[in-house]
């Protein structure tokens, strides 16, 4: 084979990889990196700046959820969802985590009553969808001992699972995971997400040497599974209401909900686990266990 043949072969191979990744991959990558940089900056800046970012994101998520479920007739229900998310976030930021959690069921009941029977269950779920991860993330970051590292761990695992799942699915995906809900999800993508997250989780031992590398790896894999479940749940929600995306705010990704679905699920799971394992130190519960 001459040089020209090699060149043609290489170009064809490159074109094949590009086609599998999709024409929107560069835009998705750029948007993802930009969002990651913003999240990391606010996380490192301190507990209060991080809380501000989380609350702002929760307000947008509440808006997108309301528009998805109720359309242009969202009105007062969305106002309740947004107000509850803001109140819960503020209470958590000033250390009143118990009151923040109490605000969620109250807001959910109010949203249900105001929905007047129209998608009332989804009105209630919207309050928890935006509010619970908001409280959990702010609570996690406020942990004086390991809060910063715990939040970084969560974000890194979610990003790893999302990226590895996307790449493995696009490049090697053959077996559909749940085609009726998410046609592009594959078992190969799920396996790639779990393996990559387990590896990254185990490597986090170099950052937190007092933790168990095996436990961190297992935690990474479990959180990756939760993130993928969150992604599927949001896909099911969009399919239920006949929407492709929840918004157009982020190029290549859709709305904020489309980008943080995995983080919402993981943060909620971490918060609930912390209440059970070590309510006094959510970061310790995540990274070290009991």
Regions found by a protein language model. Give the residues of each.
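Divalent-cation-assisted or electrostatically stabilized phosphate/pyrophosphate-binding catalytic cores
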Residues: 185-191, 248-264
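Juxtamembrane boundary at the C-terminal end of a transmembrane helix
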Residues: 274-290
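Juxtamembrane/transmembrane-helix interface segments of polytopic membrane transporters
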Residues: 201, 205, 270-274, 278
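Membrane-embedded alpha-helical bundles of polytopic integral membrane proteins
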Residues: 2-221, 225
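Interfacial helix-loop-helix junctions of multi-pass membrane proteins
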Residues: 233-249
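Final/C-terminal transmembrane alpha-helix of multipass membrane proteins
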Residues: 259-275
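Re-entrant/interfacial helical elements at transmembrane boundaries that shape
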Residues: 170-171, 238-241, 264, 268-269
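Generic detector of well-ordered alpha-helical packing
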Residues: 29, 65, 163, 229-235, ...
